[in-house]
């Protein structure tokens, strides 16, 4: 009997357009005109230094605790994400794997998934994604592929990872384990350009 393919899919930056919500929330409170393309790295404390300078609160805390409702609950889904998610379910088991900083953020993630039509039955909140032994990991954070134990790494494009070279995220500890590494503009593009054309292994 053929083993079922398992897709591990991240939430933020893959299903949920958190970046857009963060930038809009920041601009609203700081009367600024920053764009998503200005977010040059994953660590928001370095991208939004004005927050700590003017409030004394680190940007990560400001976004993910003080303004978590605007950032997490009010975020829109990434374009085509739900259709792609449902499409992947026809090819294997899809689990949602995400690191959420606080218990409140985890609850907000579950509420958001349910509100936007995603299932909440197979959700795993996990900081260390090297513990995953799935066929695919689909993520926007290149660090989650370091020392990975997945067979196929799929990096979803974002302004903060556009300068990342694909093979730079693989090191000697996992180069023999990983079968393929690729990048796509979105989960929808991965589904339409790769999965539908027989790329699933």
Report the location of each language-model feature.
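A structural signal for isolated positions on well-ordered beta-strands in alpha/beta enzyme cores
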Residues: 93-95, 136, 154
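Acidic, Mg2+-coordinating phosphoryl-transfer loop and its flanking beta/alpha structural elements
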Residues: 138-182
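Metal-dependent phosphoesterase signature
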Residues: 34, 45-80
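Substrate-recognition "cap/lid" segment bordering the active-site pocket of phosphatases
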Residues: 99-147
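Short, acidic loop-to-helix structural element flanking the phosphoryl-transfer center
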Residues: 67-96, 104-107
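Active-site neighborhood of HAD-like aspartate-dependent phosphohydrolases
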Residues: 1-57
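Structural recognition of alpha->loop->beta junctions
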Residues: 112-126, 169-195
């Amino acid at each position: 009997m053929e083993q079922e393919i398992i897709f591990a899919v991240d939430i933020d930056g893959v299903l949920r357009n958190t970046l857009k919500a963060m930038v809009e929330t920041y601009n609203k409170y700081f009367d600024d005109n920053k764009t998503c393309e200005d977010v040059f790295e994953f660590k928001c404390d370095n991208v939004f230094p004005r927050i700590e300078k003017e409030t004394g609160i680190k940007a990560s805390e400001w976004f993910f605790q003080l303004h978590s409702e605007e950032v997490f609950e009010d975020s829109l889904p990434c374009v085509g994400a739900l259709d792609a998610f449902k499409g992947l379910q026809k090819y294997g088991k899809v689990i949602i794997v995400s690191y959420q900083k606080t218990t409140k953020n985890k609850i907000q993630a579950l509420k958001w998934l349910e509100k936007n039509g995603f299932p909440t039955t197979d959700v795993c909140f996990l900081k260390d994604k090297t513990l995953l032994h799935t066929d695919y990991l689909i993520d926007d954070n290149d660090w989650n592929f370091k020392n990975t134990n997945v067979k196929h790494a799929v990096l979803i494009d974002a302004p903060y990872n556009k300068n990342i070279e694909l093979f730079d995220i693989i090191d000697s500890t996992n180069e023999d384990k990983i079968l393929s590494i690729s990048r796509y503009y979105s989960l929808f593009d991965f589904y339409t350009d790769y999965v539908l054309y027989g790329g699933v292994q």
